[in-house]
Amino acid sequence: MEEVVAEELDDEEQLVRRHRKEKKELQAKIQGMKNAVPKNDKKRRKQLTEDVAKLEREMEQKHREELEQLKQLTFKDSKIDSVAVNISNLVLENQPPRISKAQKRREKKAALEKEREERIAEAEIENLSGARHLESEKLAQILAARELEIKQIPSDGHCMYGALEDQLREQDCALTVASLRRQTAEYMQTHSDDFLPFLTNPSTGDMYTPEEFGKYCDDIVNTAAWGGQLELRALSHILQTPIEILQADAPPIIVGEEYPRNPLVLVYMRHAYGLGEHYNSVTRLVNSATENCS
């Protein structure tokens, strides 16, 4: 009987953990949706509020149904516990009533639910006052002034190349992340004098040896190594196009200014993810006037 109860508790704990994870993922998704909509776009902000409320209602309903299903599975044991308590009361009328196993499970579930709600509330406060939220608000204002908004790129180590791939796609240039990485490494290897002086061994502080530089270029091609300004400089020469990097707390950076084409525009975010810096692409802002005319 004790083994059965342990299994039921494990099932309930697993369900609560899964619900907690799904709530966390939903909050991250909602934050991404909020970041993508400029603060001054009232129409889209209103629609966003409705969409967020709908997502939260649907998840809450789903979680209630799953908890109810689990409760039904344990209903039989609860009835057995209740009968056992009643028999005990008949035999030992003066004995104080005991808390049933089902009641203990309900109390434990309520405590876990309260803890989860407190964590969500703390996370919401942190999001609204933290560096990530402030950075997103500043970037939204900068982009809105240009009639642009952020286009999210996955944070998988390829984000800089992925953002450029997206920008090039808008110009009908079908270069993939893999192709951009390969061409970057090849350009840096054939122009090593332009890049080698800026690369140092983090352990010794010495400039990279030719062997270390070769491995650096191999990693560009064969791993999800994060790209930075050296790689952007190489890509601007490869594409013969300027690349403009917008950021929240500093003026824009433009590499490849010597080229006369319209720049590819990236957004650099220092606080977007806990693991470090991140690049996103941009897209044209669809304002309320355009929507009303369509």
From Swiss-Prot:
Tell me the ranges covered by the OTU domain, including all copies: 148-285
- Enumerate the active-site residues: 156, 159 (nucleophile), 278
* Organism annotation: Mus musculus
EC number, UniProt record: 3.4.19.12
Query: What keywords appear on the UniProt entry?
Result: Acetylation, Hydrolase, Protease, Thiol protease, Ubl conjugation pathway
State what protein this is by name: Deubiquitinase OTUD6B
Which residues lie within the region annotated His-loop? Answer: 268-278
**GO terms, biological process:** proteasome assembly; protein deubiquitination; proteolysis
According to the record, the residues making up region (Variable-loop) are: 220-230
- Reactions catalysed: Thiol-dependent hydrolysis of ester, thioester, amide, peptide and isopeptide bonds formed by the C-terminal Gly of ubiquitin (a 76-residue protein attached to proteins as an intracellular targeting signal)
What is the name of the gene encoding this protein?
Otud6b
Induction summary: Up-regulated by cytokines but followed by a rapid decline in B lymphocytes.
